[in-house]
């Protein structure tokens, strides 16, 4: 099933944002009971709305095809059994092959994040592994079932550098990880200057 996305002039309560309306193919840019809305600011999706314009703020995510489709499925805009493709303006489809995402983009305070590998262009992703996060600390590294590895308890900073190190060391991912659906805390100098490599080494030494 094909949907099309058009720009809207209205921004509603989101000043400085660009509004997009999503309709079924050939329905045109008008507002109907099947319409859905996406609000974008600084090239990030900041909110979505249904046809009644009941809005939901989301943690800002890059305005990409994959992120748009994930939000659409999180909010049940489309039937999961249908192959949906959105054509339109605005989104950048250049995207890393690997991402780290909250279990649901709709969650404001996620605790479990999954590493995912994009299998092909249209929506398909493969679960690679995951991490648990509490109070901005990575507390556990999760392997897929049947992987033959035990999950590992760790105590690591929840930063982009360490996320990429975990992906490389534990899951053999040599691509940059795109963090989706969640804004990482700002990186601050720790009280004890422990390097990333030392943290990873200590985690390895404590593997059970």
From Swiss-Prot:
Tell me which Pfam families the record gives. AdfA
> What keywords sit in the KW lines?
Host-virus interaction, Inhibition of host innate immune response by virus, Viral immunoevasion
One annotated GO biological process: symbiont-mediated suppression of host innate immune response
The keyword Calcium appears for this protein: no
Q: What does this protein do?
A: Plays a role in counteracting the host DarT defense system.
Q: State the family named in the UniProt similarity comment for this chain.
A: Belongs to the Anti-DarT factor A family.
Q: What is this protein called?
A: Anti-DarT factor A
């Amino acid at each position: 099933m094909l949907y099309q996305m058009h720009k809207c002039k209205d921004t509603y309560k989101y000043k400085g944002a660009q509004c997009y309306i999503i309709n079924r193919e050939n329905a045109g840019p008008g507002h109907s009971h099947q319409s859905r809305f996406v609000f974008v600011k600084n090239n990030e999706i900041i909110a979505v709305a249904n046809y009644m314009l009941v809005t939901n703020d989301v943690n800002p995510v890059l305005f990409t095809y994959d992120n748009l489709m994930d939000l659409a499925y999180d909010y049940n805009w489309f039937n999961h059994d249908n192959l949906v493709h959105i054509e339109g303006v605005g989104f950048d489809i250049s995207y890393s092959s690997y991402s780290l995402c909250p279990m649901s983009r709709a969650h404001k305070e996620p605790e479990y994040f999954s590493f995912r590998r994009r299998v092909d262009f249209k929506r398909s992703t493969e679960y690679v592994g995951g991490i648990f996060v509490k109070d901005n600390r990575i507390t556990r590294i999760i392997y897929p079932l049947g992987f033959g590895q035990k999950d590992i308890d760790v105590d690591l900073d929840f930063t982009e550098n360490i996320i990429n190190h975990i992906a490389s060391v534990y899951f053999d991912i040599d691509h940059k990880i795109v963090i989706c659906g969640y804004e990482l805390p700002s990186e601050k100098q720790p009280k004890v200057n422990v390097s990333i490599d030392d943290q990873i080494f200590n985690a390895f030494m404590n593997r059970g």
